[in-house]
């Protein structure tokens, strides 16, 4: 990949094999960047050994498992082509509660990286452990409205969904009624939700 400057340092032109993930095509091309934004992409003649492609998005990660704070994780991730991440900080939240969420979000702002944080849905993870914190449905309803939280993270409590635990149902109602996204980690379980007036009914289908 080559890089040339035009019209001063504010405009760059990159040449290489462009990976078009939407058209499922790879072709020699030229990408023009001005003031940090792509202004044009076009085909050109030539042969290149390098590739130009969108950055990867890590769709689900617990950064705590890397034993690094977000800013350090970002440095390592970018070197491997990852430019954004959807984060579920439930490990640190089970120890420190809301303080842990705030730490992860505040630290992530130190990095030039697209961090997106979801709100842990199972704190504690199960009813059979001694955790450092608890986040119930009422707290969930308050936290999920924050601008720096994009939705409710993985619902790991499959029994709580199947047997309609009141706290679990309230948490899922909160995210659905506010049109936030949610993720699930319930093996062999399909969850569907149907809004009926002011209430939300959940149907669980074990497979």
Predicted regions and their residues:
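N-terminal metal-binding scaffold of metallo-dependent hydrolase/deaminase domains
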Residues: 1-46
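The start of beta-strands in P-loop NTPase/AAA+ ATPase cores
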Residues: 10-11, 29, 53-55, 186
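Active-site regions of enzymes building and remodeling cell-envelope glycoconjugates
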Residues: 44-49, 200-201
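Di-metal (Zn2+ and/or Mg2+/Mn2+) metal-binding site signature of metallo-dependent hydrolases
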Residues: 50-73
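A cross-domain feature marking catalytic cores of carbohydrate-active enzymes
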Residues: 61-63, 88-89, 117-121, 154-156, ...
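Histidine/acidic-residue-rich catalytic or RNA/ligand-binding cores of hydrolases
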Residues: 69-70, 98, 164-165, 190-199
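Divalent-metal coordination cores built from histidine and acidic residues
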Residues: 74-179
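Functional cores that coordinate and move charged inorganic groups
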Residues: 169-207
């Amino acid at each position: 990949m080559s890089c040339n400057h035009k019209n001063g340092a504010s405009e760059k032109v990159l040449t290489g094999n462009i990976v078009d993930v939407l058209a499922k095509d790879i072709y020699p091309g030229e990408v023009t960047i001005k003031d940090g934004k792509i202004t044009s992409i076009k085909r050109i003649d030539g042969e290149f050994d390098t590739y130009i492609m969108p950055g990867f998005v890590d769709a689900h990660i617990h950064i705590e498992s890397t034993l690094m704070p977000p800013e350090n994780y970002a440095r390592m991730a970018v070197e491997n082509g990852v430019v954004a991440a959807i984060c579920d900080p439930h490990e640190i939240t089970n120890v420190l509660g809301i303080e842990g969420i705030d730490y992860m979000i505040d630290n992530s702002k130190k990095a030039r990286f697209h961090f997106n944080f979801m709100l842990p849905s199972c704190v504690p993870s199960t009813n059979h452990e001694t955790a450092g914190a608890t986040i119930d449905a009422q707290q969930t309803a308050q936290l999920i409205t924050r601008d720096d939280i994009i939705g409710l993270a993985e619902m790991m409590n499959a029994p709580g969904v199947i047997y309609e635990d009141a706290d679990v149902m309230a948490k899922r109602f909160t995210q659905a009624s506010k049109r936030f996204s949610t993720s699930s980690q319930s093996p062999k379980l399909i969850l569907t939700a149907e809004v009926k007036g002011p209430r939300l009914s959940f149907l669980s289908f074990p497979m």
